[in-house]
């Protein structure tokens, strides 16, 4: 009987070790997804700040404002490249690569537009207007890609949280079931042992 009762603490320790292992792996994954989601939000904010700096250049045209635009977009490009290294899903990696290419194209067009505006050369007004239109289209495309990336990352994070909740629920149910079956088995064996002992005394 003593040996059978001793199974309980061993079973409890075994189940707790499994629970701790699964929880550690699951929570680490959720924390990683949450961190990536936060970085994706930062990229969206960086894009907004970069585009605002373009409008500021248009309102107050000078070299400092131009350099600020270039600095903001180059920083955004570097941050996207770093962010891409943390991703594993091909479509999100592709979104990052396409965003970096768009930024490169955007800056080339912006530099040309900025030079025309800084020189106040009316002879190149048509080219200037064309550059503005191209920048608007590229900016919108870039915005869509970063927002799509951000949305997908948020969905992945939410799915990870749901998966963790489901795993813990299933684990709790299995734990209760194991203890119930184990206790029933041990109780029957104890009762059987006691009956055998009783029969032995009466014989």
Identify the function of each model-found stretch.
Residues 2, 59, 64-66, 84-156, ...:
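Polar/charged, Q/E/K-enriched amphipathic alpha-helical segments with strong coiled-coil propensity
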Residues 7-13, 42, 151-201:
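Selective recognition of signaling/oligomerization transmembrane alpha-helices
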Residues 25-35, 58, 185-188, 192:
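Juxtamembrane transmembrane-helix termini
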Residues 49, 56, 75, 82, ...:
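The DHp (HisKA) dimerization/phosphotransfer helix of two-component histidine kinases
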């Amino acid at each position: 009987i003593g040996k059978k009762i001793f199974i309980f603490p061993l079973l409890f320790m075994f189940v707790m070790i499994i629970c701790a292992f699964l929880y550690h792996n699951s929570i680490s994954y959720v924390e990683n997804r949450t961190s990536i989601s936060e970085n994706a939000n930062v990229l969206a904010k960086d894009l907004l700040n970069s585009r605002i700096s373009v409008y500021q250049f248009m309102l107050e045209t000078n070299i400092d404002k131009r350099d600020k635009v270039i600095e903001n977009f180059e920083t955004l490009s570097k941050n996207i490249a770093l962010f891409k290294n943390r991703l594993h899903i091909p479509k999100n990696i592709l979104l990052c690569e396409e965003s970096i290419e768009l930024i490169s194209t955007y800056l080339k067009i912006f530099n040309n537009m900025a030079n025309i505006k800084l020189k106040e050369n009316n002879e190149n007004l048509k080219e200037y207007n064309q550059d503005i239109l191209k920048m608007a289209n590229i900016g919108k495309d870039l915005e869509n890609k970063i927002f799509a990336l951000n949305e997908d990352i948020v969905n992945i994070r939410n799915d990870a949280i749901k998966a963790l909740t489901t795993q813990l629920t299933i684990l709790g149910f299995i734990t209760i079931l194991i203890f119930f079956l184990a206790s029933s088995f041990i109780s029957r064996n104890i009762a059987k042992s006691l009956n055998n002992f009783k029969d032995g005394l009466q014989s």
